[in-house]
Amino acid sequence: MKRLLPTLRADQTSESLISVINTIQIAAKEISFRLHQGALAGVLGSTLDENIQGETQKKLDVVANQLLKTLLLESPNVHAVASEEEDSIVESPNSGHYLVAFDPLDGSSNIDINGGVGTIFSILRKPEGEETSENMFLQPGKAQVAAGYVLYGPATMLVMTTGKAVRIYTLDQTVGEFLLTHEKAEIPKDTKEFAINMSNRRHWADPIRAYISDLLEGEEGPRGKNFNMRWNAAMVSDVHRVISRGGLFTYPWDARKPEKPFKLRLLYEAAPMAMLVEKAGGKATDGYSRLMEIVPEHIHQRVSVVMGSANEVDVCMDYHKQHPKPY
C-alpha cells in the first residue's frame, strides 16, 4: 500500500504543501494515541474553561489544540493558524506561505462515551503583500489548496484532497504510517439516508421542517421511498458516512438562540467539508448558496449546512426556494 507522502508527491503536490500536511498528520497520530489511551492517559472529562464559542472545553480539546498549534507554528511553511479554540489568529515566527484553520477535536462531547471524534483542517495560501491579520483568512472555500479531516474511530483515518481526488488513508498502528486504502472516494448521486439532529425540529425554519417531514413519510409520502436517519453528534463521523456511501448531512438554521442561529463554523468546519464533498462528486450549500462561494466575515462565522449526495441536495434546495430566508 502507498504511504501518504509518496502519494502526495505522485499527485504533484508542492513540497511546501506536503510539509504542512505532514505536520498535521504527525499531530493527528499523537492525538489518536491520546484518544485510544482514554482514561489511562487521564485526559477524559472537562476543564473549567470555555472557548471563544462559549462552549465548555474538554481536556482533549485543549490537548489537541495545543499539539496542532505548536507543531504548525514550528513549520517554516506556515504563516499563521486559526482554531476553534483560539479567540484570534496566532502568528508564526516564520514567514511561511500557508494559513491553516482547524477544529482540533470535532464532536468532543463524544469523548467520554468512547464515540467517534475528529480533526478538521483547511489550508489556504497567504495573500501576497498583505499584513498579518485575521483578514488573511477571510477567503472563500474555493480558495483552499487542501482540506481534510482525521476520523478517530475503530480505525484512525485521514480523508483529504489537494484539489484532485478525495483519498482515504488508514493509520497502520504497527508501522505508525497513514497508508492509502481508498484511491478515489465517490459519493453516489442518490441516497436514502439523512443525518440531522431531530431534537431541534420545533425550532427549524419552514423549508427544512417541510423537507424532513416528507422524508419521514417514506413510501406513503411525496418522495415515494423510505429513508433512514443517522446521527452521530460529530460532523466528522456523519460526513465520513456520506463520503463513504452517500447520504445527506444537514445542520440548519434554528431559532433556539437568536444570537447564535447557526451551529457550524464556516472557515474550519463547513468550508473544508464542502471541498471534500464537492471533490467526491457531491454538493454542499447553506440551503440557498454554494458553501464554497461564501466569504467569511470573521474567522468564527457560523453557517447553515446542507451537503451530500448531489441529487438529494438539489431536492432540499428546492424546498428552500419555496420560502424566504429566515435570516
From Swiss-Prot:
Any GO BP annotation: gluconeogenesis
Binding site for substrate: 106-109, 197, 263
Compartmental location: Cytoplasm
EC supergroup of this enzyme: hydrolase
Positions bound to Mg(2+) 1: 84, 103, 105
Cofactor notes: Binds 2 magnesium ions per subunit.
UniProt cofactor(s): Mg(2+)
Catalysed reaction, written as an equation: beta-D-fructose 1,6-bisphosphate + H2O = beta-D-fructose 6-phosphate + phosphate
GO-annotated molecular function: fructose 1,6-bisphosphate 1-phosphatase activity; magnesium ion binding
Domain of life: Bacteria
Predominant localisation class: cytoplasm
E.C. no: 3.1.3.11
Protein family membership: Belongs to the FBPase class 1 family.
HAMAP family attached to this UniProt entry: FBPase_class1 (MF_01855)
PANTHER family: FRUCTOSE-1,6-BISPHOSPHATASE-RELATED, SEDOHEPTULOSE-1,7-BISPHOSPHATASE, CHLOROPLASTIC
Subunit structure: Homotetramer.
Identification of the protein by name: Fructose-1,6-bisphosphatase class 1
